[in-house]
Amino acid sequence: MWAIPTYLLAAFAEIGGCFAFWAWLRLGKSPFWLAPGMASLALFAWALTRVDADFAGRAYAAYGGIYILSSLVWMWAVEESPPDRWDVLGAAFCLAGALVIIFAPRGE
């Protein structure tokens, strides 16, 4: 099943793209950060269309849980700020919901 790797690709592409804008507007980085940021956001949008889902809304709902976990990984790895126990607990709840949506037996 390629759903999880595809969602992870989408998540890190979205987070990276949004972080480029954050770096420009909040961290004072060069506007040259915007070009790779926009390319990363385009990759994110493309990746989400590759998920095997019958409805966009279901794909986006499942993606939400993966995105939350990925955001905390980004915060820890890139911004060097480890998540606290409440971040981890909240992400666990969201990930559980996403996994139910992804792996639910449909049409059976």
UniProtKB/Swiss-Prot annotation:
InterPro entries documented for this protein: UPF0060 (IPR003844)
Pfam family, one: UPF0060
GO CC terms of this entry: plasma membrane
Swiss-Prot/TrEMBL keywords: Cell inner membrane, Cell membrane, Membrane, Transmembrane, Transmembrane helix
Bilayer topology: Multi-pass membrane protein
Residue spans crossing the bilayer: 2-22, 27-47, 59-79, 85-105
Compartment(s) where it occurs, according to its Swiss-Prot or TrEMBL record: Cell inner membrane
Family per similarity comment: Belongs to the UPF0060 family.
Designated name of the protein: UPF0060 membrane protein amb1014
